Amino acid sequence: IILAGTNDIARNTGYISLENIFGNIVSMCELAKLYKIQPVLCSVLPCEKYPHRDNIEPADMIIELNEMLKNYAKKNKYIYVDYHSALKNEYNGLPAEYTKDGLHPNKECYKIMKEILLDALK
């Protein structure tokens, strides 16, 4: 299960383009396949604002990256777990009841994510 990208969008280790973030995730999938592991790609969770990076507006970048991931998963016949569509609010962020800081899921959110994942794996 590959759920990655939000820390790169937040530029936690410096700037990285969406294309390079996507390329890194593709590399993870290729490594998994090399070792006979079937990748399961997950969308990046919704986030309107990063609490530690108020100069970055991630919502649109997350949507764009998720579209790239969804298309890649479809092309390669990988399972795609769309957390974003199921969890986003009207601002493309996590609803307040699912997070303390707008970024990290809380226990209630993880329960919902579990069900979304199990449903996708059926």
Name the predicted role of every residue range.
Residues 1-122:
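Alpha-helical cap/lid subdomain in secreted, periplasmic
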